[in-house]
């Protein structure tokens, strides 16, 4: 069952004071709230410690109304010696709704130094679903990662190297103990050497747990009469953990080669360019987005299951992350075509609708994420007869993939060099530099990092033996304007129907594994028509001869477990040579091929996974907090099949 998220509540007492069962009485005085937050900044020594750093990461147990984040952001903005990129990771079991957060921080309007930041936070506030939510401010230089869920669980799943901790002291039936021994052990797991902390808790049990896990502890008195602040740093006397927190890949220059200019590759280009990398993008076709990313439109939605399995959590994270990135592109002037009326996923049977209802009830998601429609509601929404109800995703829909790619390349600006009509025959490595080489042996580009985003050809270029991709032929059909009834929004089920801006209806698509024939087939059009006529009776009217219909053939490359391949590629040769020692290995134990990453195997979900995959790779390269929980990072790890072979002693 999923970890159902319960929001904090807010009420106003008779004396006008805002109170919350989860947080008690909320601050009324902006200056006092700011002073309280600034004590935490001073206690962790931030202004001195983030000077000249590329990135600096703060982890907070308990976000509340965001006061400490807003004060930290203001201090960062005011400091000319600040770090280049500030990461703030906050755990919150009971986040406020957007409107309650607006009310809760209303007292900050009087503090002009942070009121603008508060407005930006409220505008970016994410949907109330569990997991990690990444928000960017100040052109991406301030990054807030909100971990919605229980503190102990979320910290154990967090992949980060923390430079400082703000330790809340909220202990209630609603929050549990946010400074339990388990929580403190999880903090020690992600602490960088010398990481500092500050807390208002003076519980001796907390002090003991901190000292037992490698933190020092001392009290700092406050001259203004406030209670003493407990501070310290991570300075273990002996090695206390099996795996060290992630570090940035050491490179002589922030340069990368990305091979493949579809959804996966263009997303990587944009995310690396945003961090100051220079990229050579190599595409074998004359234009970007020429394979599956060249379809007129693609549907975009998350999956939902009652048990909230890996696929559900991954697609939810990808869906929300893509929405945030696309809004950022549009705000920066790089708009592209996408529908804005939501999307309906119709059930294929009564049993299928029951499964949808169970998944909907289990997650308890808000209506801005998903709504359940019975048959009558679905019929009214679509103004068409339907056999069953389904799920309405108000922010789902259809997107023009090539437009997304073009927007991402435009956002990268001068940091990307495109080599179109260029095919990479092989990769060569000389010390710390990768070279992309053509069939004649000429060097096309060189860099310390290569990201393979070229779908089916990635396995060949990387020489992988333990990642298998399968091509799946997909033929879509275009129905001419006037041949169908109006369809208010994209609709999917067994097949899909997408209204395009010019009145054309896009329907599809066939699913033909191991078929690599690019020829358009009449039988494919017939199959697509039959599916959509069953899905939406009454949608399709009289048609011209099927042989005259237009369409497109493209190929999705899928992995056996239907989960993408994202992250650093394993050094398979070294792993095989040490197979016996690695038979019980975890993903973090496996040797990696330095500087070689993969972003492929996206199948039919490139729109959902591409932006998230790009952010994951960029974060891994930079040693930043990852945008996914550990279990999900492991699920997309390119080495997962090698790990299974090692554990099954199929190697060696």
UniProtKB/Swiss-Prot annotation:
Cofactor(s) in the UniProt record: FAD
One GO CC annotation: cytoplasm
SUPFAM superfamilies (UniProt xref): FAD-linked reductases, C-terminal domain, FAD/NAD(P)-binding domain
Domain of life: Bacteria
Region feature FAD-dependent cmnm(5)s(2)U34 oxidoreductase, mapped onto this chain: 259-652
GO molecular function, one term: oxidoreductase activity, acting on the CH-NH group of donors
Compartments (UniProt record): Cytoplasm
Name of the protein in its database record: tRNA 5-methylaminomethyl-2-thiouridine biosynthesis bifunctional protein MnmC
Main location: cytoplasm
Known role: Catalyzes the last two steps in the biosynthesis of 5-methylaminomethyl-2-thiouridine (mnm(5)s(2)U) at the wobble position (U34) in tRNA. Catalyzes the FAD-dependent demodification of cmnm(5)s(2)U34 to nm(5)s(2)U34, followed by the transfer of a methyl group from S-adenosyl-L-methionine to nm(5)s(2)U34, to form mnm(5)s(2)U34.
NCBIfam families (alphabetical): MnmC_Cterm, PRK01747.1-4
Family: In the N-terminal section; belongs to the methyltransferase superfamily. tRNA (mnm(5)s(2)U34)-methyltransferase family.
Keyword Amino-acid biosynthesis: no
Entries under Pfam families matching the protein: DAO, Methyltransf_30
Start and end residues of each stretch annotated as tRNA (mnm(5)s(2)U34)-methyltransferase: 1-235
EC number: 2.1.1.61, 1.5.-.-
Reaction equation(s) it catalyzes: 5-aminomethyl-2-thiouridine(34) in tRNA + S-adenosyl-L-methionine = 5-methylaminomethyl-2-thiouridine(34) in tRNA + S-adenosyl-L-homocysteine + H(+)
Keywords tagged on the record: Cytoplasm, FAD, Flavoprotein, Methyltransferase, Multifunctional enzyme, Oxidoreductase, S-adenosyl-L-methionine, Transferase, tRNA processing
A biological-process GO annotation: methylation
